[in-house]
Amino acid sequence: VIGRVSSADKVAIAKEAGADHVIVDTKGQFGQEVLRLSGGDGVHVVYDGSGPKTFPGSLDSLRRSGTFCWYGPVLGGPGPLDIMSLPKSIKIGYAVFFDHVHTPALLHARSSQLFDWITSEKLKVRIGGIYPLAEAAQAHADMESRATTGKLLLIP
């Protein structure tokens, strides 16, 4: 697992979450380092929720027939794509939460599985901050500034 973070203070968090290697990058130019770490082949799959700046680096990181999973981009989408110019026969998907829980039964089953994983500590949830509900604007500003890691909780 190769992780990409935007600042050195997030390296330990990425390693704690299971990354074998962590690249610190703020310009979206991490593709060459991923290729080096993967022996020149690239990776099988990239999960990218950052935004348009990381899109080219994510594409460059993939091996032939790799999969690019774009999800919840915090900083906007990549803009129009010319699918004829995509390299290496890659596959691109955009994950939308509601498509995976579109029935009450699916929502119940997947939430139960999620909470089982949390309870058994198979999945660890990192709490990045706790804010009174009256400070929701500050929580949003902190998240938008990318200074936080983990989940932010609002307490009524």
Tell where the protein language model's regions lie, with residue ranges.
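General small-molecule cofactor/ligand-binding pocket signal
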Residues: 23, 91-93, 126
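A structural signal for short, well-ordered beta-strand elements
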Residues: 23, 79, 129-132
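Short conserved AdoMet
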Residues: 39, 63, 87, 147-148
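Adenosine-nucleotide cofactor-binding segment
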Residues: 1-54, 103
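Short catalytic-loop micro-motif centered on adjacent basic/acidic residues
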Residues: 42-47, 67-70, 125-128
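C-terminal capping/lid region of NAD(P)-dependent oxidoreductase domains
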Residues: 122-130, 137-156
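Glycine-rich phosphate-binding loop and adjacent beta-alpha segment
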Residues: 5, 14, 53-122, 155-156
